């Protein structure tokens, strides 16, 4: 009888752990992807120039870069649930401040949003490795799909949400606080249940420092792969609506093209990690990512609105696979949960530092060349570096532990 109760309790908390992964992941992109379609409204309302506008996307990325190492160092010592709760609280406050209606709170809110998302970015891969050690590929796929499905809706419905709420861009961006608060409740009950339920523990332990990770060549390749694929993603999420408007697309249709890109990412983000987990190494997948990205960038640049939907789907597939590979590398290249979190911390710190330069550089190159040619050359060169880093990170080996 007692054994049946233990089994039933363990199954219940397994489902709750799945819900934690899903709910946390839904908050890790949507507050950022919702910005692109309403960026023009924000700039007009608050009188922002091009550089200030690009900071709305760049600030969260700089926060990912500056805080990921600290989060990875202390989360395993102090508890993943505490950090997730703290991150969701920061995210909720940041969303509210960002839509307050003036420039200072706009940027302070963006700062807090970046810090809150940083916690989820770093800790969730470790949570997956701890809670689902035998289903890493599957749970990474679920994590990536949930993240990008909500990101797709955030970009596709951003303008509509502003119209439906009657609050304009403030409604478009503010509505996401509801999801953050619901996620906070789920994480709270999961942590509470692990304290009370028999046999359900968080596996908290003291770990060595993170410095040795930065001496690993493999960890640097993983970080570069993470950074360059994020740079490409955030550059296009931020500026593609403006590019398409210059090409002649109606402004109201640009959000739907971003929606199509995000939707195209979803199938490959679910299937990709499962297949990659079963492969001897992931170098072939890294090559496929680079080919797909180069193809989509070429169509956007050369054919403009002709073949635009083919380019969008191709970009979604290649970007979806590149992101899932990045997250999967954190766990596949680590022998322990502690090491997975440290690799995640380094990769996201270095990676998002690289990515944060994407939107400002892409926008600055457009100021130099109004045809967007220089901006697309910048992305093409980045993809070549992505292929090199992916080929190295895809080798079947481990980051050595201290």
Please provide the spans of the model-predicted regions.
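Intracellular juxtamembrane helix-capping segments at the cytosolic ends
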Residues: 119-132, 321-335
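A late C-terminal transmembrane helix in Major Facilitator Superfamily
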Residues: 334-372, 378-379
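Juxtamembrane intracellular "pre-TM" segments in multi-pass secondary transporters
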Residues: 2-11, 192-222
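Conserved MFS/SLC helix-loop-helix module at the cytosolic interface between two early adjacent transmembrane helices
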Residues: 66-104
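Helix-loop-helix hairpin linking two adjacent transmembrane segments in secondary transporters
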Residues: 103, 134-192, 239
């Amino acid at each position: 009888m007692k054994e049946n109760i233990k089994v039933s309790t363990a199954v219940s908390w397994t489902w709750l752990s799945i819900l934690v992964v899903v709910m946390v992941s839904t908050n890790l992109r949507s507050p950022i992807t919702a910005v692109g379609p309403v960026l023009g409204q924000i700039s007009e309302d608050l009188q922002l120039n091009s550089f200030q506008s690009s900071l709305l996307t760049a600030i969260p990325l700089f926060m990912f870069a500056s805080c990921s190492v600290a989060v990875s160092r202390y989360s395993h010592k102090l508890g993943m649930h505490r950090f997730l709760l703290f991150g969701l609280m920061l995210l909720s406050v940041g969303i509210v401040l960002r839509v307050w209606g003036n420039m200072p709170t706009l940027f302070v809110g963006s700062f807090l949003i970046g810090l809150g998302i940083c916690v989820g970015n770093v800790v969730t891969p470790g949570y997956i490795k701890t809670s689902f050690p035998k289903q890493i590929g599957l749970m990474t796929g679920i994590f990536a799909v949930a993240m990008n499905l909500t990101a797709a809706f955030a970009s596709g419905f951003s303008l509509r949400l502003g119209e439906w709420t009657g609050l304009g861009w403030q409604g478009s961006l503010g509505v996401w606080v509801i999801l953050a608060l619901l996620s906070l409740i789920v994480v709270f009950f999961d942590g509470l249940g692990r304290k009370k339920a028999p046999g359900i523990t968080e596996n908290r332990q003291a770990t060595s420092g993170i410095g040795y990770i930065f001496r690993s060549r493999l960890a640097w390749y993983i970080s570069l792969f993470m950074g360059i694929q994020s740079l490409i993603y955030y550059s296009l999420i931020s500026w593609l609506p403006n590019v398409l408007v210059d090409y002649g697309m109606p402004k109201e249709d640009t959000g739907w093209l971003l929606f199509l890109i995000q939707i195209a990412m979803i199938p490959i983000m679910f299937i990709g990690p499962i297949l990659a987990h079963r492969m001897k190494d992931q170098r072939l997948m890294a090559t496929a990512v680079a080919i797909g990205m180069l193809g989509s960038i070429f169509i956007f640049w050369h054919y403009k609105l002709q073949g635009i939907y083919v380019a969008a789907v191709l970009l979604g597939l290649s970007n979806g696979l590149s992101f899932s590979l990045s997250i999967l590398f954190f766990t596949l290249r680590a022998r322990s949960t502690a090491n997975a979190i440290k690799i995640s911390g380094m990769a996201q710190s270095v990676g998002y530092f690289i990515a944060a330069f994407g939107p400002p550089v892409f926008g600055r190159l457009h100021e130099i060349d109004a045809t967007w040619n220089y901006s697309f050359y910048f992305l093409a060169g980045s993809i070549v570096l992505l292929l090199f880093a992916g080929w190295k990170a895809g080798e079947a080996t481990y980051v050595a532990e201290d």
